[in-house]
Regions:
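Non-catalytic, glycine-rich low-complexity segments
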Residues: 28-29, 41, 164, 175, ...
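Short edge beta-strand segments in beta-sheet-rich domains
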Residues: 35, 142-148, 170-172
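Short helix/loop capping segments that flank catalytic or ligand/cofactor-binding pockets
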Residues: 48-50, 141-142, 161-162, 183-186
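Extracellular/periplasmic metallocenter environments
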Residues: 79-92, 98-161
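Acidic-aromatic/histidine active-site loop/patch
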Residues: 169-199
Length: 199
């Protein structure tokens, strides 16, 4: 589709919610694609990770770890505005495994503190995909500090069982497994850092 054709499509603004919850969405949609708009703000802040008061400097999408789950339908255009507030100290971006080219958008969404970027791509295959921050040279660090989440691309006519019968879910949650990496000092205590950059 051309930019003019995309501009005429229905636009749907989505308010993201923190996992394990997932934003409201339709399970089936009509044949005409839509532009589904999301906005995420990057946060860098200290968080407490256990009952003993252990902390880490997290980097997060929309202040949650993992980041919010985004739901679109096959053929829709996912449009994300990624905001890196001026109060942050590091550059960030987003790599969508549901997208192809330009490192899943990472090369097109590099944002320094005080900047924002908007990326739009066509969700052309169904499934559940990861997204994460992918700055050159420090992908793993940003991911283990919390910058990852999920995109779910549903079939336009909804989910079906192997026999082709329609499936409907009453609730949907984000479930995943990830570890936090917090080094220990020579006495065995978890280290504490003054900033994300120091960690």
């Amino acid at each position: 589709r051309t930019e003019d054709q995309i501009a005429k499509l229905e636009r749907v603004k989505v308010d993201l919610v923190a996992p394990p919850m997932v934003h409201k969405h339709e399970q089936k949609v009509g044949p005409e694609p839509r532009v589904v708009e999301f906005r995420m703000t990057i946060s860098e802040r200290e968080i407490e990770v256990d009952r003993d008061g252990t902390t880490m400097h997290a980097m997060m999408f929309d202040d949650s770890m993992p980041g919010p789950t985004m739901v679109v339908h096959e053929g829709d255009y996912l449009e994300l505005t990624l905001v890196n507030p001026a109060t942050n100290t590091m550059p960030h971006n987003i790599d969508f495994h549901a997208s192809t080219g330009a490192l899943g958008g990472a090369k097109l969404t590099n944002v320094n503190p005080g900047e924002q970027a908007t990326l739009r791509f066509k969700a052309d295959r169904t499934g559940t995909f990861v997204y994460h921050c992918a700055p050159e040279g420090s992908v793993a660090w940003h991911v283990v500090q919390g910058m990852h989440g999920t995109v779910m691309v549903l079939p336009r006519d909804g989910l079906k069982d192997p026999a082709g019968n329609a499936l409907h879910y009453d609730r949907v949650y984000t479930i995943g497994e990830f570890d936090l990496y917090i080094p220990r000092d020579e006495k065995g205590n978890f280290k504490k850092y003054g900033s994300s950059a120091e960690s």
